[in-house]
Amino acid sequence: MSAREEKHQRGSKRPAARREEEAGCGSWEQADLGNEERKQKFLRLMGAGKKEHTGRLVIGDHKSTSHFRSGAEDQKISDELEHQYQQSMDSSLSGRNRRHCGLGFSESETAEEKAPPPPPEHPPKTESESESSSEVSSEEEEEEESDSDSASDDDTAHKRKPTEQSDKDIPDSKDPKSNYKMLFVKSTGS
């Protein structure tokens, strides 16, 4: 072909024969799939099958919907649904199903529950020391019990979380994760 013919072909439309071939790609009815049963199954799976109507459908003709509810029944059903909704919200917010909270879920209660107990105030004693000071230790325990009964809730919370003391040492940061990381770094460093 000459350059003139190529230029003419580039600007011209495609011949009609190609259009017919391309249109054949979407017509599944003409595909040879074997017997009629396989063809119908293929068309149904592809969503191109003709749907057969089994009869006339009348809205509200079903037996279960043929009766009308009274206002009292509607109110009772809506109250029951609201009650069920409130129960599910309360149970999900109470933390009963914590496994559904997702990654990174943290709550102040979980930190208190999993926190290790504080170390004993007195160093462990040997057997000879413990026998001689058994009377003294029982008096000390009684004093500690009376002190703990009179102590406020803030003091007990303070004993449970020794890391809260260092919150004052850390510069103010509004991100609680940042504070936690800094506390962890400070506690491991010293």
From Swiss-Prot:
Skewed-composition ranges (Basic and acidic residues): 49-83, 162-178
Compositional bias segments (type: Polar residues): 84-95
Record region (Disordered): 1-190
Top-rank taxon, per record: Eukaryota
Biased composition range(s): Acidic residues: 129-154
Family: Belongs to the SMAP family.
Alphabetical list of PANTHER family matching this protein: SMALL ACIDIC PROTEIN, SMALL ACIDIC PROTEIN-RELATED
This protein's name: Small acidic protein
